[in-house]
Structure formats: C-alpha cells, structure tokens
C-alpha cells in the first residue's frame, strides 16, 4: 500500500501494460528527462497541441466549449504565447489498475521557466492518453519540447478496493485518444 516504487512501476508496465510505450530507464541527456524514476514516471508530451487564442472572440465555457478558442499546432517545438495556455497529450497510454490512483506534478525544469503543468488525477480503472494543461505564466513566449518530459506521475495504491472505478462509471474521458476538449455528460 502507499506510494509505489520504480520496481513496481516497471513490473506493472512490462507485465500488465500499465504504461505504453514504457521507458524502463530515466532518459535525461540533452532532453527534458522522461521515463521511470525512483517513485514515479516522467511522462512525455506528444507533438500535437491546441493553443488558446482570442481570435474567435468567444468566452471559454467548460459546459459549452467553442473550438474557435484554440488553434491546432503540430511540431517538435510548440511556442506558447505570453500569459497563455495550451493543451497537449501524453505519448504514453495508461491502463490504470482498479486499486491505484495516479497524481501528476509538473517538472521543475519547466516550472523554473514559469511553465505550470496541470493534470487531473488518473482514477482507478482509467484507460487512455492523458490530456495535459500547460500554462505560460511569463510575459515571454515559452518553448515546449515535443517527445520529451513534461510532468511526473506518482502512483498510490489504495488501502482497500474502491466501490466504483472510473471504468465502472463509464467516465466521460475513458479511452480518450489525442487531445480531448472539455466534455459535459448530457
């Protein structure tokens, strides 16, 4: 029970396909690091981004999201405008065990540049790519490097099974692929 180690993460990813693709070692020379670490896994950001813009002139409404609020971008380096925001997704696809919750925290390399990464918890039973929220809090444009590390995931095993997993309740983001915009169940 509790916070899971590198050996547990490796075993679950190799044997149970918890993380696909899975980097068994920490990769860190010449890149923002990614792969397994002592008590976590550093995820990579893909090369597709949705950058928020004010060109459409609409209001951001999570209950009725207008796709005119974002511009699609694909490339090795994404420039997030000053005081702006982008969405991306992980390269990795997750298959969460029914008794494990994952929490994701931004990497210090980006945080020290004013880049804040937010990802909501990966609930027990969740399957899919992870949509990543990236905020540039600086007055300057900021680079995000595709196919490199963006955040660290910590895995926490519950003391007892939960009554209902994300899969059981057919969560609205279950089995998401690509960047998923806000959804409201109707």
Curated annotation (Swiss-Prot):
Catalytic-site annotation from UniProt: 133
Identification of the protein by name: dCTP deaminase
Tree of life domain: Bacteria
InterPro entries xref list: dCTP_deaminase (IPR011962), dUTPase-like_sf (IPR036157), dUTPase_trimeric (IPR033704)
This enzyme's EC code(s): 3.5.4.13
Catalytic activity from the UniProt record: dCTP + H2O + H(+) = dUTP + NH4(+)
Keywords: Hydrolase, Nucleotide metabolism, Nucleotide-binding
UniProt source species: Campylobacter concisus (strain 13826)
Family, as annotated: Belongs to the dCTP deaminase family.
UniProt pathway: Pyrimidine metabolism; dUMP biosynthesis; dUMP from dCTP (dUTP route): step 1/2
Subunit details: Homotrimer.
UniProt cross-references to PANTHER family, sorted A to Z: DCTP DEAMINASE
Function: Catalyzes the deamination of dCTP to dUTP.
CDD domains to which the protein is assigned, alphabetical: trimeric_dUTPase
One Gene Ontology term of the molecular function aspect: dCTP deaminase activity
EC top class named in words: hydrolase
One GO process term, biological-process aspect: dUMP biosynthetic process
Binding site for dCTP: 107-112, 152, 166, 176
């Amino acid at each position: 029970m509790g916070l899971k180690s590198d050996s547990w993460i490796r075993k679950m990813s190799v044997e149970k396909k918890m993380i696909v693709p899975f980097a068994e070692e920490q990769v860190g020379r010449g890149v923002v690091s990614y792969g397994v670490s002592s008590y976590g896994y550093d995820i990579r950001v893909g090369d597709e981004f949705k950058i928020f813009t004010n060109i459409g002139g609409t209001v951001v409404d999570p209950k009725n999201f207008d796709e005119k609020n974002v511009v699609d971008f694909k490339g090795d380096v994404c420039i997030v405008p000053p005081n702006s925001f982008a969405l991306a997704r992980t390269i990795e696809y997750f298959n969460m065990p029914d008794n494990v919750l994952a929490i994701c925290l931004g990497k210090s390399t980006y945080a020290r540049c004013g880049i804040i990464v937010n990802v909501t918890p990966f609930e027990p039973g969740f399957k899919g790519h992870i949509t990543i929220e990236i905020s540039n809090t600086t007055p300057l444009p900021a680079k995000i490097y595709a196919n490199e590390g963006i955040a660290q995931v910590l895995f926490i095993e519950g003391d007892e099974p939960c009554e209902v997993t994300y899969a059981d309740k057919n969560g609205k983001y279950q089995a998401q692929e690509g960047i998923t915009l806000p959804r409201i169940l109707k």
